[in-house]
Amino acid sequence: MAAGADVPCAVLALLVLGSLAAGGDATAGFIKSPLSQRRLTQDSVELHCEAVGSPIPEIQWWFEGNEPNETSAQLWDGAWQDRVQINATYNLHSTSTIYIANLTSDDSGTYECRASNDPDRNHLSKSPKVKWIRSQANVLVIERPVITGQYSSSADKVVLSCNISAPPTLIKGHKWMLGDKVLKTDESDASSYISYTIEGKVEDHSGVYECIYNTNPVAKGNVSIEVEPQVVAYKKSEHGNEGDVGVLTCKSPSYPPVDHWAWYKSGQTVPLESSAGIYNISRTGNKTELRILKLNIEQDMGDYSCNGTNMKGSGSATVNLRVRSRLAALWPFLGIVAEVLVLVTIIFIYEKRRKPDEVLDDDDGGSAPLKSNATNHKDKNVRQRNAN
């Protein structure tokens, strides 16, 4: 039915836009109407309306409660103790969205979107020539059901459970979520009692878990696992050069978030504080960072402790800081130079010792050809005698 209802709206929009292109006037008409909805108390609701016309029509929102003698009243941005917000735009056509927060049962009733482009639509004494067009949506606010959530834990397992009483409609499944992550989905279970098992220690799985029942409207409960901060160091050991900036980081993934962070140097009971030219400490939620602006090899080297505290207790971690002298970076280069010098010296000594041996070898090589020549002469004489 929604698709069929959109067809006349689309046709009307084309007719009005065609009239606008031709430069003529056109009475106001809806191209989107608000839809009826069901909500639970403490939830919020949003209704949307769009209209076309020439000139561009004005849109207003009106409300009439379910009480027998209640009359219709216009809604304004900021009404009902600032629970009502209305956003409207007037460009090629009119759009308006009304948002109502923290619903109560008194908010049930008929919400009406009105549109008109008659010049006299808001005149106090003159009646408009064209009546306001109207589109209505019913909002039913149902009392929120009671959902009891709890957990139990052992050495290696955590069991979450929820139980709903007086669901608004039949239950058609459920799911478990942690933040934006879906942990488990069951679309066939119609039970009011549901559970979810987590393998591991309770300290490693803190947070706010949601149990969501597939009813109309959707009913949500939560199970909160709260532990003391499980503080860990980003690196257990950090290195820095003298004169540079040293950065030590700690974090806690636990829930509730850390309320207070403190840094201590080994052997000191007074926490470090940010001071110009020495320390800069940042604390952002579950993360803290200690910056030592100019590392000193004598004063800054050692162990540092980061301590986090929340409503459940406190936790800490230790980071070891090692500071190197600026000359430390030259040692590898000096080592290479020393190796090259030793190698050159060895080659030089070897060459010096090898030269006398080469001279002796040259003398022996000069006498050898003489013996060879004498032998050749003897061979020639022997061949001559044989020839004779």
Swiss-Prot record:
Q: Which residues are glycosylated?
A: 163, 222, 280, 286, 307
Q: Does the keyword Transmembrane apply?
A: yes
What PROSITE patterns is this protein classified in? IG_LIKE
The Ig-like domain, residue ranges = 43-131
Question: Sorted alphabetically, which SMART domains does this protein's record hold?
Answer: IG, IGc2
- A family per Pfam: Ig_3
Q: Does the keyword Glycoprotein apply?
A: yes
Question: Keyword set for this entry?
Answer: Angiogenesis, Cell membrane, Cell projection, Disulfide bond, Endoplasmic reticulum, Glycoprotein, Immunoglobulin domain, Membrane, Receptor, Signal, Transmembrane, Transmembrane helix
* Region spans: Disordered: 358-388
- Provide the protein name: Basigin
Source organism per entry reads: Gallus gallus (Chicken)
Q: Which gene encodes it?
A: BSG
